[in-house]
């Protein structure tokens, strides 16, 4: 499949809230489960709710900070500010369910 033929999904499992300032999403992945391939078109804040280990699998044309495969131990309460540009799949490589809240910042 070429990049032009690629179908991108939502950045997380479920959209919780949207207004003129933010979009708030929930990501929920069982152990071994992958998210859809998705593109981050806005800067966002990621807050870990549950889980122990996650991987980010970038697409070849991913931009931004996370443009290489990454694995990370995570803990509930951790948060990260991430700039837009990433095109990736999230993969739960842990032993526990992984849940996060992603807050996309509109300008």
What is the predicted role of each segment?
Residues 41-63:
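Glycine- and acidic-residue-biased ligand/ion/polar-headgroup-sensing regions
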Residues 34-36, 52-57, 79:
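Short beta-strand segments in beta-sandwich/barrel cores
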